[in-house]
């Protein structure tokens, strides 16, 4: 049975939801697009909780009616058996709903609704690592496209064999960060490289960083801390390619973070894109510091988001992907084709379970 504290929390959520519903109908709000969007988003984030609470309330009414029927059917064995069976099903459903409600009330990550910059860097393994980084970029692009998200290449440094030394994807859509934040870490591949003449299996790595997009208000950058150089671009630019210096090489002196942007058509656009990436990187550093202080008090298997954490091994010979946090295997090819939902949902489930254990 749900605790009084849980029920009070749910009533508060319901009251807030109703208040936001009223505000959405306010003509003054309708004339302010930014405020309208903010309220609609806040209301939408509570909708699943309120619906589950209403389902739970209806279930409790059904339980009371079935218990009353059971008491009244003592003289009718057949009716009594039916009432007992229904009561058992309702109680099982009640337990499931209460678990769902508890999860829905867990503290939300304020970044969950944000778009992201997803950075993939080749690690150990030379050109094979760069090829692997390119494979990961394709995997995430396919996953994003399946969910109807938009993906564009924000920055790219290519390897000699066509792989990626470093790639940054800008991914926009519904709750992008909430799903992809558990992808941060070291992705290891075991396969025979295209450069291997003897057919031996090599191990290479690529590192994934997931950075929520932030605006200028959230991360303030002192212009004196920025050093910008320009260069001729080999990227998009039509007849301007290699004639006009459209590429931007940006250095943030306090941290040593360097961002090189060539993908836009003008120097101004590349400069704006480089600053956007820098803000995301600085914000991610801040999140890492916060996470490190939390992790010193508790050790969770998922959710640390550390760049150095080995999270997954992709084994081509055995046609399997092993997620080391879940201690679980998945078929390789569907994962590479962007079918990541089962894996990501398993990570979210484990994170929620660990968070529940911590809060209790």
UniProtKB/Swiss-Prot annotation:
Post-translational modification: Methylated by PrmC. Methylation increases the termination efficiency of RF1.
NCBIfam families referenced in this protein's UniProt entry, alphabetically: prfA, PRK00591.1
InterPro entries (alphabetical): PCRF, Pep_chain_release_fac_I, Pep_chain_release_fac_I_sf, Prokaryotic/Mito_RF, RF-1
Record has NAD as a keyword: no
Subcellular location: Cytoplasm
One Gene Ontology cellular component annotation held by this UniProt entry: cytoplasm
Protein name: Peptide chain release factor 1
UniProt keyword terms in alphabetical order: Cytoplasm, Methylation, Protein biosynthesis
Family: Belongs to the prokaryotic/mitochondrial release factor family.
Single GO term (MF): translation release factor activity, codon specific
Role according to the record: Peptide chain release factor 1 directs the termination of translation in response to the peptide chain termination codons UAG and UAA.
Gene transcribed to yield this protein: prfA
Any matching Pfam family: PCRF
UniProt xrefs under SUPFAM superfamilies: Release factor
């Amino acid at each position: 049975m749900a605790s009084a504290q849980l029920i009070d929390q749910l009533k508060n959520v319901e009251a807030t939801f109703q208040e936001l519903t009223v505000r959405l109908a306010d003509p003054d709000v309708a004339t302010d697009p930014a405020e309208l969007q903010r309220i609609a988003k806040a209301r939408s984030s509570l909708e699943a909780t309120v619906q589950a609470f209403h389902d739970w309330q209806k279930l409790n009414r059904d339980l009371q009616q079935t218990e009353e029927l059971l008491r009244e059917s003592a003289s009718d064995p057949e009716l009594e058996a039916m009432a007992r069976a229904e009561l058992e099903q309702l109680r099982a459903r009640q337990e499931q709903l209460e678990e769902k409600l508890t999860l829905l009330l867990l503290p939300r990550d304020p970044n969950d609704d944000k778009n992201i910059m997803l950075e993939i860097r080749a690690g150990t393994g030379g050109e094979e690592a760069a090829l692997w980084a390119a494979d990961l970029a394709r995997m995430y692009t396919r996953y994003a496209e399946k969910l109807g998200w938009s993906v564009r290449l924000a920055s790219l440094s290519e390897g000699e064999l066509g792989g990626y030394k470093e790639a940054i994807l800008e991914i926009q859509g519904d709750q992008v960060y909430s799903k992809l934040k558990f992808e941060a870490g070291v992705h290891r591949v075991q396969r025979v490289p295209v450069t291997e003449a003897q057919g031996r299996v090599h191990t290479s790595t690529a590192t994934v960083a997931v950075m929520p997009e932030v605006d200028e208000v959230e991360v303030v950058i002192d212009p004196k801390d920025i050093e910008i150089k320009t260069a001729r671009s080999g990227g998009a630019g039509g007849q301007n390619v290699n004639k006009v210096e459209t590429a931007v090489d940006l250095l943030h002196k306090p941290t040593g973070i360097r961002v090189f942007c060539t993908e836009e058509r003008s120097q101004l656009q590349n400069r704006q894109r480089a600053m956007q990436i820098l803000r995301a990187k600085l914000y991610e550093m801040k999140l890492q510091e916060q996470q490190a202080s939390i992790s010193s008090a508790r050790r969770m298997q998922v959710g640390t988001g550390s760049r150095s954490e080995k999270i997954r091994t992709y084994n081509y010979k055995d046609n399997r992907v092993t997620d080391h946090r879940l201690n679980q295997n998945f078929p390789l090819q569907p994962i590479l084709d962007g079918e990541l939902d089962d894996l990501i949902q398993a990570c979210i489930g484990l994170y929620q379970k660990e968070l529940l254990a911590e809060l209790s």
